[in-house]
């Protein structure tokens, strides 16, 4: 469709704004200044607010949040609480909250759900890591920023306001702050994102963009656009930039973190830097319109030329301060990440949090900051307490996770040297892909890799090339920032597409009913489709119900597009239009109800024991057992498991009602928060809420008991770490728990009988045996070492000269450990050892002067693998044949 948007609004006519074209960038803009020739934005105009605040008073960040919110509240907008910075809490396509409109996507923006208020105002903290390497260096970039926004959602039934009022509000707010109207320009522009599009204004003053006013009204379809029924006012005001411009500080960081910056400078012993230098750097950065770190070296050169200083001296002077700026920004970002419950890991949002944390720790090391990162983040939490008290409520978790992650980082760095040395041994260059692999797989920052390689180059026989891109962290963050949908292999894909009405689910209204009658709408292959059913279809982690239709077994139940498919053992017994009688296997259903209710109970208990940060990442409810996967930053201890189990059973004994209600999505979110999505994102404007009174509330479509007492005894059977940052709890309920306890008891009794001791003596006896075994193992290892030394002399005369190396190929009696001990004694210098035992075990080991890879050698003479200096496997040929093959390889 052809789009001809008129950017003229009522305010422009009333105040006699003029439309002009920028002489520098050719963009069209509106201004009150009849003499203006440029659009006002950088790089067409330089920052003119540094050292010269543009508002009638100076605003702190907290004051600016309040001023912005109060202004729009006075204009009839309902203030809405911020959402978490973890967008995964309510949507599954992005990990972090990157804009205020993300809070209302996809349900509100696509018209499925009404907005919680209309119009509304929100000050939404956002995180974007696509500029993380620019932070601290340009004077304006932040990883964590607050997008002030007023949104209006206009439909044919409910119209609020559009372009005229939006521009009027913006201009009035800026004048209320004391900004001269003649300095404000409205640049005509176009916005696209998330499949939507619309015209917009970029609102500029004194060289800096303070707001963007978007009018979302189109859907992008290929290269064309379609008008959408919901017209959305989507504005974004940079709260931090408003505060910066009101204070006129050299960089945005002083306006936000002045107290923290001063403490860090004092701690690191960094001398004062002339504010004019930092102001010049920030101003020139604006003129250069820096969007990639490659331009930063050019920026440094330009600043040096402008102030008449050598570029290396300038770099030495301001780099430490730039690190401090970055630390201040990153610790605020981490305060939101951890305060909103992110658990560090090697995937998804946990990966991004760990990236920011380790980058911060590296910078702290680099400039010698002695205070802990916990101290810095404690200051951040205190500073934000007035606006975001909920972050301080999570302080205990934040401090605990920082402790755990700092220890992991130190361990990573300590083992990093060996990892890098092994990689460098077989390479002439450490590439960007190598650096990313070392970071992703081993957590090694590129700076540490470079330090190790530089040391190797100084004392090594060869030179290994390495270049660390200035934007390394941006590159790795962008690879992980977007959520990629996981491929799920499901039986639902095999189900046919049908044009019948959705199946009425009777178990919501009649949770204890076991029999029903229904009409057959369709016979689809091996499935029967009914107009209504009591059978629960597999979903939400819960297994399907089983039972009968007209005495014919129902062995599987699936759902697709709201239609329930019943798999029966004899499809020939059914025909469309017939009425059938359905009967559930009630014992099976009861077990599923108990185990599903137990999932909620254990989740609530785990939250009390481990903390509010835990988040359900998956569950599986079967008849015999259930399992729950939750985020947590360390292994769950035995004592914590016992406490979780105790609290869970206390809830069972307390006979707590389990209530099921259907609620409007907005009402549920406002009442309970985003924790209702613990079980996963639920579509639609109406949610089924399961509430265990004052304990656990979740949006859930499964079958549950009506009271916790019906669950029976809960036994946590085991926990395991299924991936970094995720713990799995496996449990049983009722008679299942009795059976599991009996198995454990039998194991203990059998073990005690084998040892011929009473049950209560088992732990002490096992401990004694274990200590004795360790002593014997130590003695055996010492004997093996002595045997190896003796065999060394026996084999010393059996080496043969092959090419440049002394080669030993020998069959030796002994275990793999004994052969390893022998090889350790012999593999020195230019010696190459190949040992075999009578069990087909094969060992290849080389001395430090042998360049041939043992991993490659073993593949040529047998089967196996290993490293360049040591390989193990199996052999099938004779000693003579293996010797001949080695000679051929070495004499090539």
From Swiss-Prot:
UniProt keyword Nucleotide-binding present: yes
Catalytic activity, as annotated: tRNA(Ala) + L-alanine + ATP = L-alanyl-tRNA(Ala) + AMP + diphosphate
Organism: Methanococcus maripaludis (strain C6 / ATCC BAA-1332)
Cofactors, names only: Zn(2+)
UniProt cross-references to SMART domains, sorted A to Z: tRNA_SAD
UniProt key word Secreted: no
Name of the molecule in the record: Alanine--tRNA ligase
Cross-referenced InterPro entries: aa-tRNA-synth_II/BPL/LPL, Ala-tRNA-lgiase_IIc, Ala-tRNA-ligase_IIc_anticod-bd, Ala-tRNA-synth_IIc_core, Ala-tRNA-synth_IIc_N, Ala-tRNA_lgiase_arc, Ala-tRNA_ligase, Thr/Ala-tRNA-synth_IIc_edit
Gene name of this polypeptide: alaS
EC main group: ligase
Protein task: Catalyzes the attachment of alanine to tRNA(Ala) in a two-step reaction: alanine is first activated by ATP to form Ala-AMP and then transferred to the acceptor end of tRNA(Ala). Also edits incorrectly charged Ser-tRNA(Ala) and Gly-tRNA(Ala) via its editing domain.
């Amino acid at each position: 469709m052809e789009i001809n948007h008129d950017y003229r609004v009522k305010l422009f006519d009333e105040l006699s704004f003029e439309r002009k074209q920028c002489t520098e960038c050719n963009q069209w803009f509106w201004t009150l200044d009849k003499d203006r020739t440029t659009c006002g934005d950088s790089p067409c105009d330089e920052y003119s607010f540094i050292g010269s605040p543009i508002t009638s008073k100076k605003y702190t960040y907290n004051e600016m949040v309040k001023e912005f919110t109060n202004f729009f509240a006075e204009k009839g907008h309902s203030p809405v609480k911020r959402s978490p910075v973890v967008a995964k809490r309510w949507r599954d396509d992005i990990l972090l909250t990157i804009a205020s409109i993300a809070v209302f996507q996809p349900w509100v923006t696509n018209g499925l759900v009404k907005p919680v208020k209309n119009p509304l105002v929100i000050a939404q903290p956002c995180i974007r890591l696509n500029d993380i390497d620019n932070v601290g260096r340009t004077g304006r970039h932040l990883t964590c920023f607050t997008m002030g926004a007023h949104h209006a959602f206009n439909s044919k039934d409910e119209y609020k306001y559009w372009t005229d009022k939006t521009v009027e509000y913006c201009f009035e707010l800026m004048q209320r702050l004391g900004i001269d109207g003649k300095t404000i320009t409205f640049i005509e522009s176009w916005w696209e994102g998330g499949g939507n599009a619309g015209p917009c204004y970029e609102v500029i003053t004194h060289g800096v963009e303070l707001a963007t006013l978007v009018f979302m009204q189109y859907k992008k379809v290929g290269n064309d656009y379609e008008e959408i029924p919901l017209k959305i006012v989507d504005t974004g005001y940079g709260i931090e930039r408003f505060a910066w411009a009101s204070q006129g500080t050299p960089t945005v960081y002083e306006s936000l973190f002045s107290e923290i910056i001063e403490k860090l400078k004092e701690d690191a012993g960094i001398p004062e830097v002339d504010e004019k230098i930092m102001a010049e750097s920030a101003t020139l950065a604006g003129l250069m319109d820096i969007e990639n770190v490659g331009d930063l070296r050019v920026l440094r050169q330009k600043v040096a030329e402008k102030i008449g200083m050598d570029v290396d001296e300038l770099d030495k002077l301001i780099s430490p301060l730039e690190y401090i700026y970055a630390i201040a920004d990153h610790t605020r970002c981490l305060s939101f990440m951890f305060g909103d419950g992110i658990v560090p890991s090697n995937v998804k949002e946990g990966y991004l949090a760990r990236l920011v944390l380790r980058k911060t720790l590296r910078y702290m090391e680099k400039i010698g900051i002695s205070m802990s990162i916990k101290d810095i983040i404690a200051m951040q939490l205190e500073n934000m307490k007035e606006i975001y008290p909920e972050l301080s409520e999570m302080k205990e978790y934040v401090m605990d996770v920082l402790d755990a992650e700092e220890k992991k980082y130190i361990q990573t760095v300590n083992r990093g040297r060996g990892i890098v040395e092994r990689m460098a041994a077989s390479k002439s260059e450490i590439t960007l892909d190598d650096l990313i692999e070392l970071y992703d797989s081993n957590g090694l920052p590129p700076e540490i890799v470079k330090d190790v390689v530089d040391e190797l180059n100084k004392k090594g026989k060869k030179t290994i090339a390495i270049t660390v891109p200035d934007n390394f962290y941006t590159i790795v963050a962008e690879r992980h920032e977007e959520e990629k949908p996981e491929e799920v292999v499901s039986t639902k894909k095999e189900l046919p597409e049908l044009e019948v009405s959705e199946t009425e689910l009777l178990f919501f209204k009649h949770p204890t009913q076991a029999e029903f009658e229904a009409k057959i709408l369709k016979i689809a292959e091996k499935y029967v489709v009914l107009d209504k059913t009591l059978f629960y279809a597999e979903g939400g982690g819960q297994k399907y119900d089983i039972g009968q239709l007209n005495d014919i077994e129902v062995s599987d139940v699936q759902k697709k597009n709201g239609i329930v498919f019943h798999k029966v053992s004899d499809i020939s017994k059914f025909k469309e239009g017939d009425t059938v009688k359905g009967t559930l296997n009630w014992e099976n259903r009861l077990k599923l109800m108990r185990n599903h209710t137990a999932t909620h109970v254990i989740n609530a208990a785990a939250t009390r024991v481990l903390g509010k940060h835990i988040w359900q990442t998956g569950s599986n409810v079967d008849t015999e057992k259930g399992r729950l996967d939750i985020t947590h930053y360390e292994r769950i201890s035995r004592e914590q498991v016992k406490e979780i189990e105790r609290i869970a059973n206390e809830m069972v004994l307390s006979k707590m009602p389990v209530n099921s209600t259907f609620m409007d999505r907005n009402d549920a979110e406002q009442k309970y928060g985003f924790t209702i999505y613990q079980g996963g994102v639920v579509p639609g404007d109406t949610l089924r809420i399961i509430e265990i009174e004052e304990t656990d509330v979740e949006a859930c479509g499964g079958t549950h008991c009506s009271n916790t007492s019906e669950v029976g005894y809960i036994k946590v059977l085991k926990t395991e770490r299924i991936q970094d940052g995720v713990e799995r709890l496996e449990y049983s309920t009722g008679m299942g728990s009795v059976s599991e306890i009996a198995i454990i008891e039998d194991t203990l009794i059998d073990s005690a009988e084998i040892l011929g001791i009473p049950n209560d003596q088992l732990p002490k006896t096992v401990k004694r045996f274990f200590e004795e075994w360790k002593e014997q193992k130590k003695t055996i290892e010492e004997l093996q070492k002595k045997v190896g030394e003796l065999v060394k002399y026996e084999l010393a005369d059996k080496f043969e000269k092959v090419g440049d190396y002394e080669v030993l190929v020998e069959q030796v009696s002994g275990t793999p450990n004994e052969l390893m001990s022998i090889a350790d004694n012999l593999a020195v210098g230019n010696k190459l050892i190949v040992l075999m035992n009578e069990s087909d075990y094969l060992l290849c080991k080389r001395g430090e002067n042998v360049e041939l890879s043992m991993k490659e050698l073993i593949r040529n003479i047998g089967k196996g693998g290993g490293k360049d200096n040591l390989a193990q496997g199996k052999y099938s040929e004779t000693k003579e044949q293996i010797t001949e093959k080695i000679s051929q390889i070495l004499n090539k």
